[in-house]
């Protein structure tokens, strides 16, 4: 099993590629979170009926996180997201500097939920 398939999720999720304008299913995207046709990031529309949280995400590897991304910490998809101020190599991990939080460390191939919009 790919580490990317172990990402935190919300109960209702729909997947699409903005470039190919194609709906995708979980089996097509869960191991890379990229479109199988064009390799662009898959957009994830996610909904939590219990909290009525509706968000749009992309899922990146830890080593793909960039300054300016908005990320959700593990288990916090229904809570605040944090602005990425920068990244650095910290031994075998990626250190992600987050505004209002401090540094959060992930493995290079660890999945990170990046918010790109509301629901």
Predicted features by range, described:
Residues 45-104:
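Long, charge-rich boundary regions
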Residues 35, 73, 107-110:
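Intrinsic-disorder/low-complexity coil detector
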Residues 1-12, 92-93, 100, 105, ...:
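A broadly conserved sequence feature marking short terminus-proximal activation segments
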Residues 18, 77, 110:
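A broadly conserved detector of short glycine/acidic/proline-rich loop/turn motifs that flank catalytic sites
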Residues 1-56:
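N-terminal cysteine/histidine-rich coordination modules
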């Amino acid at each position: 099993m790919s580490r990317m398939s172990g990402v935190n999720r919300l109960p209702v999720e729909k997947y699409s590629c903005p470039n190919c304008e194609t709906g995708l299913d979980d089996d097509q995207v869960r191991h890379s979170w990229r479109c199988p046709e064009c390799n662009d990031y898959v957009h994830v529309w996610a909904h939590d009926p219990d909290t009525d949280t509706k968000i749009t995400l992309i899922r990146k590897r830890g080593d793909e996180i960039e300054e300016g991304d908005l990320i959700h910490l593990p288990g916090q998809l229904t809570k605040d997201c944090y602005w990425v101020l920068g990244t650095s190599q910290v031994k075998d991990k990626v250190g992600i500097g987050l505004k209002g939080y401090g540094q959060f460390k992930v493995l290079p191939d660890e999945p990170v939920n990046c918010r790109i919009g509301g629901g």
